[in-house]
Curated annotation (Swiss-Prot):
GO terms for molecular function: GTP binding; GTPase activity; protein kinase binding. Its main location: membrane. This is Rho-related protein rac1B. It comes from the Eukaryota. A motif (Effector region) lies at residues 32-40.
Amino acid sequence: MQAIKCVVVGDGAVGKTCLLISYTTNAFPGEYIPTVFDNYSANVMVDGKPINLGLWDTAGQEDYDRLRPLSYPQTDVFLICFSIVSPASFENVNGKWHPEICHHAPNVPIILVGTKLDMREDRDTQDRLKEKKLYPVSYEQGLSKMKEINAVKYLECSALTQKGLKTVFDEAIRSVINPTLKKKPKSSKGCIIM
């Protein structure tokens, strides 16, 4: 059985842990407890191949900026997560997460994941954002960001409803077992750290 290491990164409270717990247990966790570091494992079949998927949850908070990269060696695929209803977490995709991954683990495939899909159409959430002159991140904005950071895919999901959830992990696995499907960089710019 092929083992694949998948590391999940993104701002605090974007739903990384909920994503992993919902996927591995089919249950949505009740309360928010910030993660320092956690590991999950799932045996799955993708395209007829048995895979042991090692899932590494990381802390998004700045306090752990020096600790988090210790989980990056030997990573096969990264999920960079942002919340669809948090424009700030979306900006941090290339403000923080993409540069950090490029620095510590260049040339590892990245899947860009928009979480909390169920909240995009939620009236209360929209009103709360409008008060700050903000709007939920659109699918088109996600696709544009995917191209900007040269990610393999952009996917959206909800850990609460599980919509799109299995697809996120199936595509993460496919980016490793079918590397020929990876997009070729448009140029040889590589990572730019500012």
